[in-house]
């Protein structure tokens, strides 16, 4: 026996009225994980990193960034200027990082800014 067909009225689907509710989207959190991993592979190609260690490194970089930004903004306000320049960032790095580490950070930062400037022109 063939299955019986339902009446035509029963086949129509009931459409719901559009609602103003939005779906909860997963909020993306931006991390430095890919950059940490790239540097790790440059320095030690055969070494891996755990999620916990990656989270610690990410927190360290975020903290360092915040400290440098805060110190730079203080220097701008102290000098009664309105524009944050590379000079204030370099001075903040000198104040926050000890000796050789500060010199190395400044040279790497200068190199990165030069590379960026030449690529945008």
Curated annotation (Swiss-Prot):
Molecular function in Gene Ontology: DNA binding; protein heterodimerization activity; structural constituent of chromatin
InterPro entries: Histone-fold, Histone_H2A/H2B/H3, Histone_H2B, HISTONE_H2B_site
Keyword list, A-Z: Acetylation, Chromosome, DNA-binding, Isopeptide bond, Methylation, Nucleosome core, Nucleus, Ubl conjugation
Pfam families in the record: Histone
Transmembrane segments: none
Record note on modification: Monoubiquitination of Lys-115 gives a specific tag for epigenetic transcriptional activation and is also prerequisite for histone H3 'Lys-4' and 'Lys-79' methylation.
SUPFAM superfamilies according to UniProt: Histone-fold
A Gene Ontology term for the protein's cellular component: nucleosome
Residues the record lists as N,N,N-trimethylalanine modifications: 2
Annotated positions of the N6-acetyllysine modification: 5, 41
Subcellular location: Nucleus; Chromosome
Its biological purpose: Core component of nucleosome. Nucleosomes wrap and compact DNA into chromatin, limiting DNA accessibility to the cellular machineries which require DNA as a template. Histones thereby play a central role in transcription regulation, DNA repair, DNA replication and chromosomal stability. DNA accessibility is regulated via a complex set of post-translational modifications of histones, also called histone code, and nucleosome remodeling.
Similarity annotation: Belongs to the histone H2B family.
Oligomer and partners: The nucleosome is a histone octamer containing two molecules each of H2A, H2B, H3 and H4 assembled in one H3-H4 heterotetramer and two H2A-H2B heterodimers. The octamer wraps approximately 147 bp of DNA.
Record-given protein name: Histone H2B
Lineage start: Eukaryota, Sar, Alveolata, Ciliophora, Intramacronucleata
């Amino acid at each position: 026996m063939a299955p019986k067909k339902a009446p035509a009225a029963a086949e129509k689907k009931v459409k719901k009225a559009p609602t103003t509710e939005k779906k909860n989207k997963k909020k993306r959190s931006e991390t430095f994980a890919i950059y940490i991993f790239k540097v790790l592979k440059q320095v030690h190609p055969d070494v891996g990193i755990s999620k916990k260690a990656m989270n610690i490194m990410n927190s360290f970089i975020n903290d360092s960034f915040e400290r440098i930004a805060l110190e730079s903004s203080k220097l701008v306000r102290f000098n009664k200027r309105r524009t944050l320049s590379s000079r204030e960032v370099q001075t903040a790095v000198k104040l926050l990082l000890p000796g050789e580490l500060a010199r190395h950070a400044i040279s790497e930062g200068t190199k990165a800014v030069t590379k960026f400037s030449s690529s945008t022109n």
